[in-house]
């Protein structure tokens, strides 16, 4: 795999009229909190009330106190917002949110980008909530400038980024030489760059799209980030990685805590993520570079990736390490549906012998369907360089026209357990293709005998409800039902739909119970 670098706007202006039309009343701050209001028609010398609002978000950020809520009226705000004042655990967060059903837009059109900078940024602050904004049009054509839609940096805790729409954040410079390894743009970025971590961060319900990222990522947690939840986001149509959990890039002062960790990546939908035609990936190849992951863990640890949909990307999900002698570890990938990705469904291990390893990870109860669509023979599961002590169980893998199911082109592969999976391929059991420790085997039986893998696995049609319509629930007669290995320590409590994970005699194979 070739990789270069990191893979109606205005609401009603009269609240009473809105209530008369049946709109919900605006939310209220807690009894101990204070309410402030900002409007494009306001003035920063006003009182900051609903009747006499401020004009700028920055004035509100410089004034708000712990436990307060800044209600932002609909309209366009063409200024950056830098939040450095904190809420508190006792009084509550400082919350910046849209007013009622109105949509405030923070628009970066014409604004300069200074080094690495967020259109909205939270620097060394804690107990902050940013909710219900559209954040857009923050761009540059200058190398070494990094525009970010929402940027959280330094240290802090108790930060929530909720229900925001982030789009058209771009660096359109054409990289050359060493610039291929640089950072270019992000939709949402969390960089733990201090000895104290960024902890307790929630990124939920956001939409990120039309981002020109170069060698960077759509949504990323990097460095000293400890305890995070990336949930229920929609990430699509961007030119590099969708969601990334990163370690060992030198973001934090010490390697000892330079890993995003103790995280949850759940309920996200990620699609149309591709590095093809991205100049940061060098000369365009005949089939494209196909190096951008929908969901990626690069050096992170102790994280669960579950109940996500990842499709029409270059790679569905990857757990790997780009840094030699460093490992991505203790990642559980379970109950995800991964389909129609160009190179492979799930990848693990370093992408060449100069990279790091994947160790002590679990890939369980996923449904992988017809990935490997562009003829690169990545199969449904791509086992790369230096994989150790990983568990791969209870997965459905249905091959594309390539007929490749598992592709492992490296001999440095020790202690991995592969069993209780269900496989299917257009060429049938005898014509299915497998590469294990760099040796090609044709046919399921030949692969089992030669490798010792999959002694309890099946080769059969999984009988999806409607695969043409991408409904990967199981028909009542599916051989995957009750055919898995019920290890409650790793399969999780719920399937892709949030239903109890075990309902019959044993767990089903695949994402659907």
What function would you assign to each model-found segment?
Residues 28-58, 76, 100-102, 462-468:
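Right-handed parallel beta-helix/beta-solenoid
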Residues 77-82, 108-119, 139-148, 170-186, ...:
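Short glycine/acidic-rich loop motifs that flank beta-strands on beta-rich extracellular proteins
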Residues 40-78, 82, 447, 478, ...:
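Acidic Gly/Asp/Thr-rich repetitive segments characteristic of extracellular carbohydrate-active
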Residues 17-28:
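C-terminal segment of classical bacterial N-terminal signal peptides
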Residues 58, 62-66, 78-95, 104-131, ...:
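Extracellular beta-strand-rich solenoid/capping regions of secreted or surface-exposed proteins
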Residues 1-12:
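Bacterial N-terminal signal peptides that target proteins for export
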Residues 93, 97-103, 126-137, 157-170, ...:
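Right-handed parallel beta-helix
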Residues 444-513:
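C-terminal accessory segments
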